[in-house]
Amino acid sequence: MSYSNILVAVAVTPESQQLLAKAVSIARPVKGHISLITLASDPEMYNQLAAPMLEDLRNVMQEETQSFLDKLIQDAGYPVDKTFIAYGELSEHILEVCRKHHFDLVICGNHNHSFFSRASCSAKRVITSSEVDVLLVPLTGD
């Protein structure tokens, strides 16, 4: 089976390169499309900050996340069609994006670091609720 529209769940960590490389290896032979989804930290968890500072912090976190995605894409050696930056529960966003954009494969990482522990938990929810195939990739740290 070949996949032509792949969604990759990445984190702002070096291990995300492994996930994107896996997506490229699947998409390249069929000239498939790749998109990325990630979580941005929500500054509201720092509720002791004043409201104006929260908005500034949210903007900074959004910019840093986008910069990471831009660098990841630049290093991929394959075009990435879309990026999605989500807040909140990753699995809900993955399922919603899959429905709206007709992805046929979701790639997630399995790692012990905090994001990937959450992502692995999210992957479990995606696997049980997804209408498309899900590939869980074991990640190794550098």
Curated annotation (Swiss-Prot):
Signal peptide: none annotated. It comes from the Bacteria. Its main location: cytoplasm. Keywords: Cytoplasm. It is found in: Cytoplasm. The keyword Cytoplasm applies. GO terms for cellular component: cytoplasm. SUPFAM superfamilies: Adenine nucleotide alpha hydrolases-like. Belongs to the universal stress protein A family. Required for resistance to DNA-damaging agents. This is Universal stress protein C. It comes from Escherichia coli O6:H1 (strain CFT073 / ATCC 700928 / UPEC). The gene is uspC.
